[in-house]
Amino acid sequence: LENLFVSNKLNDFQGKRALVTGAGDGIGEMLAKNLAGAGLSVVVQDIRLEAAERVAQEIGDAATPIAFDVSDREACMIAAETIANDGPMNLLWVNAGVGVGASILKGRPNAIEWAVGVNVLGVVWTTQAFVPLMASATGPRHVGFTASSAALRKAEGSHPLYATSKHATFAFAESLSTELANEGINSTILCPGLLNTKIWDGARARPDRFGGPRFADPALSKQWDEAKSPQLMWPEIVRSIEAGGGYLTCATDNGETRQAFESRAEAIAAHIVQI
């Protein structure tokens, strides 16, 4: 693995176990492969078993695939029972997320429920199910959350439902980070910018209860196909884990994210009044 993936430190995590959700491609695949390259054994989760198996096979003996739906609390709990049989866990990365282009005012109920189910409730159910597996772990413990740079901006533009759900992802992760700290567990809130992932076609694996699979027009993929690789985030993620976590925004837009965040904060601050 050291020949395939970027070498890194994370020495205190070598020989420990990790779980990465949404690891069948994109950011999750990058995380799973690099964690394995750092000497961890990795449980590769995806809602699509074949995707999880592909990534696990490419990693080798250090990886185990598993498939379940993070928006289904019972499925998360059952999966946790299975994974617990192999021992405690030191690192959890709550990465699974879906991209939804619908508006809020006119969005279909199933699209809204799906976005909230994965990007919001999925964060809660995943942490409720798997953080208990960290209780008996020795050595450092860390939970990562993948939010989005969209969580730092006003929730508008071409993907308002997605942006809104990621604001909620960020808020839940922020609250959970305090609860985790009380348990002696560090955490990182990762906010990536636009990257070369398949998030534009997330509905290809949408469960039936949310309307079933839907395949996006490949023409929509252009801006993602031309975007930077998720791999570029890895050195920053390593630094965050080693430093004990915190906020980590990996912007890809030449300063626009910072400007949008600062403008939003200034607009809010300008209208804080004492009564």
Task: Give, region by region, the residue ranges found by the protein language model.
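Active-site loop of short-chain dehydrogenase/reductase
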Residues: K16, P88-N90, M134-A147, N182-N186
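Conserved glycine-rich cofactor-binding loop
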Residues: R17, G24-D25
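The beta1-alpha1 cofactor-binding region of Rossmann-like NAD(H)/NADP(H)-dependent oxidoreductases
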Residues: L49-E50, F68-I78, P109
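Substrate-binding pocket helix/loop in short-chain dehydrogenase/reductase
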Residues: S103-I104, R108-W114
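A short, exposed helix-loop element centered on a Lys and neighboring polar residues
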Residues: T127-Q128, E174
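Catalytic loop of short-chain dehydrogenase/reductase
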Residues: G144-A168, A173-E174, T178-A181, L194
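SDR active-site lid
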Residues: T178-L248
